[in-house]
Amino acid sequence: NLLQFNKMIKIMTKKNAIPFYSS
C-alpha cells in the first residue's frame, strides 16, 4: 500500500532527520 509506505517514510525521516529518498 503506497499510503502505508508514505506514512512509514515520514516516520523514519522524522526519526533520522534525513530524507533518504528523493522523488
Swiss-Prot record:
Cofactor, free-text remark: Binds 1 Ca(2+) ion.
Subcellular location as annotated: Secreted
UniProt key word Lipid metabolism: yes
Protein task: Snake venom phospholipase A2 (PLA2) that displays presynaptic neurotoxicity. PLA2 catalyzes the calcium-dependent hydrolysis of the 2-acyl groups in 3-sn-phosphoglycerides.
Q: In which tissues is it expressed?
A: Expressed by the venom gland.
- One GO BP annotation here? lipid catabolic process
Q: Tell me the protein family, please.
A: Belongs to the phospholipase A2 family. Group II subfamily.
Q: Which organism is it from?
A: Protobothrops mangshanensis
Report what the protein is called: Basic phospholipase A2 mangshantoxin
Main location group: secreted
Q: Which UniProt keywords apply?
A: Calcium, Disulfide bond, Hydrolase, Lipid degradation, Lipid metabolism, Metal-binding, Neurotoxin, Presynaptic neurotoxin, Secreted, Toxin
**Other remarks on this protein:** Negative results: does not show myotoxic activities.
Query: Is Aminoacyl-tRNA synthetase one of the keywords UniProt gives this record?
Result: no
Quote the EC number.
3.1.1.4
UniProt superkingdom:
Eukaryota
